[in-house]
Amino acid sequence: MRPSGREADQLRPLKITRNFTKHAEGSVLIECGDTKVICTATVVSGVPRFLKGKGQGWITAEYGMLPRSTHSRMDREAARGKQGGRTVEIQRLIGRSLRAAVDLKKLGENTITIDCDVIQADGGTRTASITGGFVALADAMRVLVENKKVKENPIVSQIAAISVGVYKGVPVLDLDYPEDSNAETDMNVIMNDKGGFIEIQGTAEGEAFSDEHMMGMLAVARKGIAEIMEAQRAALFDK
C-alpha cells in the first residue's frame, strides 16, 4: 500500500491554471498533489552570442525553490552567492526538454526563458516544472504568432514529464515526498506526444533494479504521461 492510498499507476490530482500572472507572455500554476510550481515564459528579441547570425532561436530555463517550500526553511541561493549543483542540473533538464518541443529555426532569433519557481514541494518538482513549463511555452508561442513575430507556431511536439519509481518492490507512478525518500529506485521520464522519449534519469538507491522493474516503471510512466498530456491540452484549449 502506498502512503497516499493511491493505486500503483495512479497520478496525484493534477491542476493546471493558465494566465496565473499578468506580465509574462505565458504563465502557469501547476499543482501535482501538494507540489505547486509557478512557470512563466518570457520572450525577448535576440539570442545568446553563440547563436548570433544563425537564424534560430533559443529556449532556456531557470529553477528555484522558495525558502519555505519544504518542511524546514532553507536559505535562498542568492543569499549564498551561488546556485547549487542540483539547481543547475534541474534547470538544464528543463531547458533540454522544452527545446525538444520546438523547431528553433521557426522561432527566429528570439529567446524564451522559462522560470520555474517552486512554492510548495512534495516530490516531483522538476517533472512538474517541465509539464507546466510546456503550457507556459505554448502560450508564449501564441503571443509571438499573434504579434507576427514569427510566421508560424514553432512548436512541433507536446512535452510532458513524470516521476516513477520502485516502492516496496512495486513500480509506482508520480512519487510524492514520503515515497521518493524511501523508494528503492526513482526515475524521471520525459516524453513527447509521439510516444518518443526525450530523457530518462534513473537511479537505484542501494540495490540495482531489474529489467522487469525497468519495464514496469516505463509502462506506468507512459500511462501517466498520456493522462498529463490530456490535462495540458484541456488547459490550452480552455479560453
From Swiss-Prot:
Q: What's one GO BP annotation on this UniProt entry?
A: rRNA catabolic process
Q: Which InterPro entries match?
A: ExoRNase_PH_dom1, ExoRNase_PH_dom2, ExoRNase_PH_dom2_sf, PNPase/RNase_PH_dom_sf, Ribosomal_Su5_D2-typ_SF, RNase_PH, RNase_PH_bac-type, RNase_PH_CS
- GO MF term set: 3'-5'-RNA exonuclease activity; tRNA binding; tRNA nucleotidyltransferase activity
Top EC group: transferase
Q: Which CDD domains match?
A: RNase_PH_bact
| Keyword Cell inner membrane part of the UniProt annotation | no
Query: At which positions is phosphate bound?
Result: R86, G124, T125, R126
Q: Which reaction does it catalyse?
A: tRNA(n+1) + phosphate = tRNA(n) + a ribonucleoside 5'-diphosphate
Q: This protein's superkingdom?
A: Bacteria
Q: Which UniProt keywords apply?
A: Nucleotidyltransferase, RNA-binding, rRNA processing, Transferase, tRNA processing, tRNA-binding
Entry's EC annotation: 2.7.7.56
Could you tell me which PROSITE patterns the record lists for this protein?
RIBONUCLEASE_PH
Under SUPFAM superfamilies, the record lists:
Ribonuclease PH domain 2-like (SSF55666), Ribosomal protein S5 domain 2-like (SSF54211)
Transferase as a keyword of this entry, yes or no, is yes
Output the Pfam families linked to this UniProt entry.
Answer: RNase_PH (PF01138), RNase_PH_C (PF03725)
UniProt lists the family membership as follows: Belongs to the RNase PH family.
Q: What does it do?
A: Phosphorolytic 3'-5' exoribonuclease that plays an important role in tRNA 3'-end maturation. Removes nucleotide residues following the 3'-CCA terminus of tRNAs; can also add nucleotides to the ends of RNA molecules by using nucleoside diphosphates as substrates, but this may not be physiologically important. Probably plays a role in initiation of 16S rRNA degradation (leading to ribosome degradation) during starvation.
The UniProt subunit note reads as follows: Homohexameric ring arranged as a trimer of dimers.
Name of the protein described by the UniProt record: Ribonuclease PH
